[in-house]
Swiss-Prot record:
The keyword Disulfide bond does not apply. One of its GO terms (cellular component) is cytoplasm. This is DNA-directed RNA polymerase subunit Rpo10. DNA-dependent RNA polymerase (RNAP) catalyzes the transcription of DNA into RNA using the four ribonucleoside triphosphates as substrates. The lineage of its organism: Archaea, Methanobacteriati, Methanobacteriota, Stenosarchaea group, Methanomicrobia. It comes from Methanosphaerula palustris (strain ATCC BAA-1556 / DSM 19958 / E1-9c). Pfam families: RNA_pol_N. Belongs to the archaeal Rpo10/eukaryotic RPB10 RNA polymerase subunit family. HAMAP family: RNApol_arch_Rpo10.
Length: 62
């Protein structure tokens, strides 16, 4: 689950997650994808670049 907003500046970033993930999985350069999505601030970029989906790993413990 990607956070809805950037922890530092508060910009909404969750709307860019699905497109970023699809394009990254297709082999595009992550930096170029973030530029195309309009995420130019370092804080917002790191939110998407460093995110790891762990929800599937946590589901058995619910």
């Amino acid at each position: 689950m990607i956070p809805v907003r950037c922890f530092t500046c508060g910009k909404v970033i969750s709307t860019a997650w699905e497109e970023f993930k699809q394009r990254r999985d297709a082999g595009e350069d992550p930096g170029a994808i973030l530029d195309d999505l309009g995420l130019t601030q370092y804080c917002c970029r790191r939110m998407l670049l460093t995110h790891k989906e762990i929800i599937d790993e946590l589901n058995p413990y619910q």
